[in-house]
Amino acid sequence: MDMRRLVGRNFARLRLAKGFTQERFAEVSGVTQQYVSGLERGKRNPTVVTLYHIATALGVPPVELVTPDEEASRESARSPKRKSRKK
């Protein structure tokens, strides 16, 4: 699975579990609502520092944002493996 999508999926799940709207999370974390939306859609590639700040605002360890869940593991297993091309 693409890491941006994985982080976005985990972030959205954790944000909702903590009861934050995108707007409220943006206010408490210092990012914009547009950034939050892009992150959840897998369109943003957050830095390690940004992941740390997001995790802190959620009250979770940063590893929670990058750990595959069961759905991600199943999706990865279904994806065809890319063969490396040797030149």
Which ranges hold each PLM region?
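A short, Lys/Arg-rich alpha-helix, primarily the initiator
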Residues: 1-17
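Residue-level signal for the short linker/turn that defines the boundary of a DNA-recognition helix
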Residues: 9, 19-20, 46-49
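Residues within the helices of the helix-turn-helix
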Residues: 12, 23, 52
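Alpha-helical residues within the helix-turn-helix
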Residues: 16, 27, 56
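Short alpha-helical DNA-recognition segment
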Residues: 19-38
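The DNA-contacting recognition helix of HTH DNA-binding domains
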Residues: 22, 33, 43-44, 62
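DNA major-groove recognition helix of helix-turn-helix/homeodomain DNA-binding modules
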Residues: 49-64
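Short, charged recognition helix plus adjacent turn
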Residues: 56, 66-87
